[in-house]
């Protein structure tokens, strides 16, 4: 999840019904979201460098899942670098749009908390700004599900908003929504990953670019034991 530049989320002091209709929310904003973010990697050299490293390690090893793929731009970046990658997203409209924008790739609908993928079927998972839509209490369980579908030695690359607490939006791209996002401390995410059977390789962060929502950006890489 990203947010249009120049707009702010108020802090969520007392969570409401947490993301009561996340698929519907992304269905409503799919087109403007893609218009805003489909080419964002062109302006994010740090992210491209991390994805290039990920691609170098994944090339020729097997299938990779872009989890929470949105319009498919992260998966497309990997596909263009020779990775056997497909995208999965909770929003049917976002999946349809990703298929339209990336006709050479495969996309499907799914929930990262209960994946339809077989155990030990992926050599890598990249998931940018997807775990933020879970309540903090769900994070470890979701990571265990990701570990289930990864082969031993498979690589996980996460991106998330750094910080404390959570944020909420009632309006997104001009649409009425009710959407929540959890902010995670780097050490907190490392703890969840280790508990879910990942050996954490690296956690890095960067300040937000001026055109991004102004939270620290954190990236965590781990290998399934």
Model-assigned labels for residue ranges:
Residues 162-180:
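Short, glycine-/aromatic-enriched active-site segment of Class I SAM-dependent methyltransferases
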Residues 181-196:
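Short alpha-helix
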Residues 113-125:
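A short acidic, Gly/Pro-enriched loop at the edge of an enzyme's catalytic core
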Residues 198-209:
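Conserved S-adenosyl-L-methionine
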Residues 2-59, 164:
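Conserved class I S-adenosyl-L-methionine
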Residues 140-152:
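A short glycine-rich, Lys/Arg-flanked "PGG" loop and its adjoining helix->strand segment in the class I
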């Amino acid at each position: 999840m990203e947010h249009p530049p120049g707009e702010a989320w108020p802090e969520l002091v007392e969570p409401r019904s947490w993301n009561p209709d996340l698929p519907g929310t992304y269905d409503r904003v799919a087109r403007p979201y893609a218009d805003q973010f489909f080419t964002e990697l062109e302006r994010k050299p740090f992210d491209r460098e991390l994805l290039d490293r990920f691609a170098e390690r994944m090339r020729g090893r097997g299938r990779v899942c872009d989890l929470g793929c949105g319009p498919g731009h992260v998966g497309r970046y990997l596909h263009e670098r020779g990775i056997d990658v497909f995208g999965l997203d909770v929003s049917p409209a976002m999946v349809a749009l990703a298929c339209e924008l990336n006709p050479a790739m495969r996309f499907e609908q799914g929930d990262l908390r209960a994946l339809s993928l077989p155990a030990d079927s992926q050599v890598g998972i990249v998931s940018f700004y997807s775990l933020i839509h879970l309540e903090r209490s769900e994070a470890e369980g979701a990571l265990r599900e990701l570990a289930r579908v990864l082969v031993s030695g498979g690589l996980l690359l996460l991106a998330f908003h750094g910080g404390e607490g959570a944020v909420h939006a009632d309006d997104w791209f001009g649409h009425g929504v009710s959407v929540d996002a959890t902010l995670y401390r780097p050490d907190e995410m490392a703890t969840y990953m280790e508990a879910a059977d990942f050996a954490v390789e690296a956690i890095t962060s960067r300040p937000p670019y001026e055109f991004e929502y102004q939270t620290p950006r954190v990236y965590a890489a781990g290998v399934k034991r």
